[in-house]
């Protein structure tokens, strides 16, 4: 799994949480080319959060062809905004932001939230929100203040959460990442730390 880093304080945590599921993950910078990403032969891509706003001229650059790959893509927070904007949705400032715990209503319709209880607690940390859902997408969870907490495309290849499933504050975060890795992306839990050390030794020899 390739994680594209847009400057989130939690990017390393995403990588760690994936590896804890015995799936190899690697972090690449936001300006990584499509060619360099595909050289890793990823099963899936995760777009991290970040402090920027997608509608600003100073927003991090990225290869937009990545978003059209025939691979499952999960956008987290800022990653959700990238996917929404790319597919024709609207992202705007909330004016005051949303930081801290929130409870979500699960609407169903996506494997991403399988086994996630209605009303469960999540961790929000964002200044922007999606105000227009892209055509061909649906809101699969909402927060108590009617923010789209999670979205999915009709083909289920594009998924996104406004909250952070990688942090321990999100009650079912582990389950959500597990759903994305195994039910949606069809990853196999066959990676171990010893495998990483073995490859590292081969590269140095």
Where are each of the predicted segments found?
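RNA-binding accessory domains that recognize and position tRNA/RNA substrates
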Residues: 1-44, 51-54, 61-69, 85-201
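Gly/Ala-rich beta-loop-alpha elbow adjacent to hydrolase catalytic centers
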Residues: 75, 79, 84
């Amino acid at each position: 799994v390739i994680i594209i880093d847009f400057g989130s304080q939690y990017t390393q945590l995403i990588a760690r949480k994936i590896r804890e599921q015995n799936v190899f993950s690697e972090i690449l910078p936001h300006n990584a080319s499509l060619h360099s990403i595909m050289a890793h032969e990823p099963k899936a891509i995760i777009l991290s959060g970040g402090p920027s706003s997608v509608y600003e001229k100073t927003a991090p650059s990225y290869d937009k062809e990545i978003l059209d790959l025939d691979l499952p893509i999960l956008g987290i927070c800022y990653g959700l905004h990238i996917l929404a904007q790319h597919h024709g949705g609207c992202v705007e400032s909330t004016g005051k932001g949303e930081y801290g715990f929130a409870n979500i209503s699960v609407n169903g319709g996506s494997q991403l939230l399988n086994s996630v209880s209605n009303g469960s607690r999540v961790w929000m940390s964002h200044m922007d929100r999606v105000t227009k859902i892209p055509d061909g997408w649906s809101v699969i969870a909402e927060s108590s203040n009617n923010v789209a907490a999670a979205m999915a495309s009709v083909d289920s290849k594009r998924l996104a959460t406004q909250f952070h499933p990688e942090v321990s504050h999100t009650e079912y975060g582990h389950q959500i990442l597990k759903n994305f890795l195994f039910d949606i992306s069809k990853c196999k839990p066959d990676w171990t730390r010893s495998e990483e050390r073995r490859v590292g030794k081969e590269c140095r020899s």
